[in-house]
UniProtKB/Swiss-Prot annotation:
Signal peptide: none
Family that this chain belongs to: Belongs to the UPF0502 family.
Cited Pfam families: DUF480
The protein's name: UPF0502 protein ECA2523
Source taxon at top rank: Bacteria
Organism expressing this protein natively: Pectobacterium atrosepticum (strain SCRI 1043 / ATCC BAA-672)
InterPro entries cross-referenced by the UniProt entry: DUF480, WH-like_DNA-bd_sf, WH_DNA-bd_sf
Length: 212
């Protein structure tokens, strides 16, 4: 895959995608506004404290990679940046509004479940239900020019698997294999739980008969 963003690059791109939707009157963005967005305390995982010089270095790298372009002159007192990451006349990556919302939220907060993504992406796109979020994740996984997301191993005690973006490289085989292993082993456990529930119900019935 041609997208190989490091952590800072992913944070910058995620912030610019987010602000383009939520505060379009303040987009394109200056170095100061991008730094503020990167270090935002809400909707960020992890929370960072990047300096302007660190963000500037990242912006310069993204410009060289053709993921950003600078806007200056014509009355602009400061250099501003706009992304060319997706849905740009300069790039090939075209994403639907729902796909943009999920990709943005994954770039900003790392691996998340479909339920978490639906809730956290609400300001970017109004998913009708979790099913629509899952369907969009499937589309991102199955695109001919992708995949752009992958389902990770289900964490112990969790009902949903998390998804992560692939714009920073492929997920480890171990994560996918662990997911498959969890699924393979889930049937015997489910059967055992069902048997125990049946046994408890029978004991309750017998106890009720004795007390009658």
């Amino acid at each position: 895959m041609k997208y190989q963003l490091d952590a800072r690059e992913a944070r910058v791109i995620g912030c610019m995608l987010e602000k383009q939707i939520t505060t379009p009157d303040q987009y394109p963005m200056s170095l100061n506004s991008i730094t503020t967005a990167c270090n935002q305390k809400t909707n960020r995982e992890p929370v960072t404290e990047l300096s302007e010089s660190e963000v500037q270095q990242t912006l310069d790298l993204l410009v060289k990679k053709h993921f950003l372009r600078t806007l200056s002159g014509f009355g602009n007192r400061v250099v501003k940046y706009e992304h060319r990451f997706c849905n740009s006349e300069f790039g090939d990556l075209k994403l639907s509004p729902a796909e943009v919302a999920l990709v943005t939220t994954l770039l900003l907060r790392g691996p998340q479940t479909p339920g978490e993504l639906r809730t956290r992406a609400a300001r970017l796109y109004d998913f009708s239900d979790v099913g629509e979020a899952e369907s969009t994740l499937d589309q991102l996984q199955q695109r001919d020019d992708g995949p752009f997301v992958v389902r990770l191993a289900r964490e112990a005690g969790k009902r949903e698997s998390r998804y992560r973006h692939l714009f920073s490289g492929e997920a480890s085989d171990a994560a996918v294999l662990e997911e498959e292993s969890v699924n393979d082993n889930s049937h015997p456990l489910a059967e055992r739980v069902e048997a125990l529930e049946t046994e408890v119900a029978e004991l309750k019935r017998q106890l009720a008969a004795l007390l009658a």
